A protein has these predicted regions:
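Solvent-exposed loop/turn segments at secondary-structure junctions
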Residues: 1, 58-61, 79-82, 95, ...
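Mature extracytoplasmic/periplasmic domains
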Residues: 91-150
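Ligand-binding pocket segment of bilobal, Venus flytrap-like solute-binding proteins
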Residues: 2-77
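Non-transmembrane alpha-helical segments in soluble domains
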Residues: 2-5, 24, 42, 46, ...
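A bilobed periplasmic-binding-protein/Venus flytrap-type ligand-binding module shared by bacterial periplasmic
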Residues: 5-9, 84-96, 115
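Short beta-strand->loop
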Residues: 70-82, 91-94
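Conserved C-terminal helix/tail region of periplasmic/extracytoplasmic solute-binding proteins
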Residues: 43, 146-178
């Protein structure tokens, strides 16, 4: 639902009641034009079963690389886009703390992170990764977004409207392709 807010010049973390009501109404209109919500759209994009997809940059790269369609392109949205990151967490009470720390230390090694980035197509925040990357991979804007794309990124805030925004998105997903 973030693009609804961004198209109106608002943050997707808005607390404006009128904007939230407007988004709720808008999802009813938009839902009939949405084929699916798919967290891993690589096959749908690569096969051509969808003509437009919103997906993570690494998934877009995988779809483009595996498709026979030479016209597939990825763009970083404007005026805003979601700034996303994955993180590792060790659950409280975990019995294998040593193994968990070993795994995290392993994947934070620049050489290992470079292999993971090359394979998945997702950017790694590990310092020193560049020295371990093929220059073609290091220059790929699908992996390493341009500075202006990162600057346009907006993080999700867990503010007082977070649950409401999640509910609007859930309603949107439920109404899609009906």
């Amino acid at each position: 639902i973030a693009p609804i807010f961004w198209s109106k010049g608002l943050s997707w973390n808005t607390t404006d009641e009128a904007a939230l009501k407007d988004a709720e109404a808008m999802v009813e209109t938009l839902a009939k034009h949405i084929k699916t919500f798919n967290s891993y759209p690589v096959q749908d994009v690569a096969s051509g079963s969808v003509i437009l997809a919103q997906c993570w940059n690494g998934n877009a790269r995988q779809a483009i690389d595996s498709s026979k369609n030479e016209n597939l392109v990825f763009v970083y949205p404007e005026p805003k886009s979601e700034l996303w990151l994955d993180s590792y967490h060790i659950p409280a009470g975990a019995k294998s703390l040593k193994a968990a720390h070993s795994w995290i230390n392993y994947v934070l090694d620049p050489a290992v992170a470079a292999k993971e980035t090359t394979y998945t197509g997702f950017l790694s925040p590990v310092a020193g990764i560049e020295a371990h990357l093929d220059p073609k991979v290091a220059a790929d804007p699908l992996i390493f977004p341009p500075a202006d794309a990162i600057k346009r990124g907006e993080r999700t805030e867990r503010n007082e409207t977070y649950d409401r925004r999640v509910a609007i998105l859930t309603k949107f997903k439920a109404a899609a392709a009906q």
